[in-house]
Structure formats: structure tokens, C-alpha cells
């Protein structure tokens, strides 16, 4: 999906010349040991690179410029081992473009009660050094992640690792190219948006292509390639009898394989890591891509149906963040509701395109009619999803800013089998309850398309929104409609002032 080994996070320790060479040598040695310890943790996926201790404005400015200019550096972790007067940091913090993590830790975990003296106190000053540093970043209105805890503890290492994952997702957005195959579904509002503003804000490059750009790759697919992929389908999925070799709809699976091979070749040739399509612009494609899209998502590609490029880009970023973690991440749509006397639920699904990374068992591979698009019956993977904590995330363009909306949910098992539903699905209980959650979602302008994930928590997206400088609205167990409406109104003023530097 993405190679963690090609990326790095710089660990920068602040001090000053006041303390003398011996203290500064100890600061450097301690910093190196912290970096080595974090690099040895399985919870820290991106290699930390120790930088020389910075002790002056010039040194700080230089390392920040170097970080900006490094294509490998995806972020900086800043820690004040001793006191480091914060006015020295103003120029450097003014120019740094990479995500910032302010790490409030200490080399020693405990106070050595019987041995502590002023030498110890002068060396280990992060308790007030980091407060001085925190002030200047708040004074400069710098968005950053603050992590508090001893560097040897697992909980702290996980926090560092999770922030690194968010920085990886952000770095991915700086380089991502999204291919829109066809246009938006006609007359749909929420999938529209300002692609120029998105490129300025996120770095995402979005361009449109015709379905013929894909079909010309399909025409080049060889029989050997198709046969090899068919064998993989037979191994990875439970094929219905109609799709098995000799089945009366085997050709549909052959056509689906050609679509996958051609679409994959198109994406690889163009360097696209996310894409959209729409059933209204299929051209010479024999089927609306279903199986192909599902398998590409499973390989890490971002996808949005009906031209939804914002969800496609967000899905790719979240898949990069979640790489190697337990739980899947998929394109999703709030499809239909289940209102009962007791609990209310939402059934999430789509016409075809749900990622098998969220499957609870080996998917079945089936072919069924599709009443829209005017093409042949498409092949798709069908499955249920596991129960457990999850969230839905929606990125929308509000005209003056981008807004990220997150609803925490609890996936549950369907109350009965769904023998006549020929699509992948997941049933969830929105937090804090159906009434409050959906009311808040609608008030926020949340889309019907989302990214659904069981791998990432809300904290990942909170950190992402801070890095991007975009609005975040969270709907969870603590949400009330009255409070949520107040937040919406307050945010209108805040983001107007924030965007205009007031």
C-alpha cells in the first residue's frame, strides 16, 4: 500500500547554551536513547531520526527548513529537555510546513528522591520547558498534536505511533492523484465541490477521464492474464454455480476480470491511488465495475461512487493511516433505516462497491441484475461485516471551507439472514442514539457517502483535521442536539476569523 520504510519523522530536542557543554552532551545522549527506544517499539511504525539539539534561533530555523525540504520527512516531534526560551522558536515555527507533535515527556520516569539535586533539576526541565514552548505555539495559533507521557510506556508509544499514521495519511494527500472516470451523478449536490480549493488545502490533484481511457486498457488484456485472475477469484471467494467454470454466467466473471485488469492498468499507468466512476458514464464498459472496485479498495486504493472524489481521497488517506492495523476500512453509504420499538439502526451498503477488508468471513462472488446504468449484470462480492466499534467519516465542501464530520457507531449482527440482498452490508447503531446522531448529521450537512472504518478511532481524524486546518464535527456518546447546534453556529464565526487571520 505504502512503504513506511521510505518515510521518517524527525525528533528535535530544544535547549539553550546557558547550561554548558556537559549538560548539552547529556541532553543529546538522552535524546538519542529516547529515539532508539521508540524505534524499537512495534507501536511506532515510522522511523524516528534524531536531530542535533537546537540551542538558538538560527539552529531552529535551519532544521525546520531542512524538514520542509526533505521528501522523506513527514513530520517533526519537538521536545524541550531543558528550558528553551520560546522566542528563539518563532522564526522556525513560522516556516515549518510539516505536521508537528509536541511531545511532553522526560528522560527519567520518577524523581530520585534521595539523590535529586540542582544538577538533576537543571537537566530535567521539560515540566516547565514544554509549558514555555506550548505558550508560543498557542500564541502563534499553531495547530499541533500534544502527547503527554513517559516515552517507555506502551500507551505513550501508541500515541506517538498513531500520530505518525495520521502524518502518513497527510503526506499521502500531498501527492495523491484522483482519477474521475466520468462525471458526477447528475443533479447530486454533495458529491460536487471545489477541486482547486481541495488541491490548495490538501494537495489532492483531481482530474476527469473518459471511460474510453479505461476500455483501451481492457482491450489490451491477454487471455493468460484473465485466466490467472479467474483462478485467484476461485481461490479467494466462494463462487456461485453460475460463475464457476462451465456455469451459465461464467462470461460475466470473465468480463469482470477484464475490467479489473484494465482498470488496474489505467490507474498504475497514471499513478492514481484513488478514483471514481458513475453508472451514468460507462461508455463501452460492459458492467458497472463492482468486483474490480472492491478488490482495488482491498489493495489500498481510494474510491468514491458517482464521482465522489472527496470520499475517494479521504478513503485513500485513511487506508494509509490504518495500514497493518486490525479492522477494515471501506467506502460506505447510509442506505436504509431500521426503526423498531426498541433500538433503531442503519443498514450501510452500496450498489456494489463495499471493500472486502470489512468482511466477517470469506465473501461469496455473485452476479445479479442492476436496475440502473443500462449495462450487463455486474459481478460483486457479498458479505456481512463483523460487529464492534466503528465510525463513519464524511468530508464535505461548505463553500467557504471543508468540513469533516465523524459519527461513532457500533456495528451489530443483522437480526436475520438477508438471502435476497445481493450486496455487501453492515448494520450499525449510531452514537449516542439514532435520533440524536442523524439529526446532528443532517444539521451538519453530512453526506450519504462516507468512509467506514473499524481500524481508526476518532482521535486519528481529530489529528488529521488539525493538520489540515479544517473544521471537525464529532457525533458520539457525548453529543446533544442543542450543544451541536451551538457548535455549528460558533464554528461559522471561528472559521471566518481563522481563514482571514483575524
From Swiss-Prot:
Pathway: Carbohydrate degradation; L-arabinose degradation via L-ribulose; D-xylulose 5-phosphate from L-arabinose (bacterial route): step 1/3. SUPFAM superfamilies: FucI/AraA C-terminal domain-like, FucI/AraA N-terminal and middle domains. Belongs to the arabinose isomerase family. It is an enzyme of class 5 (isomerase). The keyword Ion transport does not apply. Its EC number is 5.3.1.4. Keywords: Arabinose catabolism, Carbohydrate metabolism, Isomerase, Manganese, Metal-binding. Mn(2+) binds at residues 306, 333, 350, 449. One of its GO terms (biological process) is L-arabinose catabolic process to xylulose 5-phosphate. GO terms for molecular function: L-arabinose isomerase activity; manganese ion binding. This is L-arabinose isomerase. Signal peptide: none annotated. Its cofactor is Mn(2+). It catalyses: beta-L-arabinopyranose = L-ribulose. GO terms for cellular component: cytosol. Catalyzes the conversion of L-arabinose to L-ribulose. It comes from Christiangramia forsetii (strain DSM 17595 / CGMCC 1.15422 / KT0803) (Gramella forsetii). CDD domains: L-arabinose_isomerase. Binds 1 Mn(2+) ion per subunit.
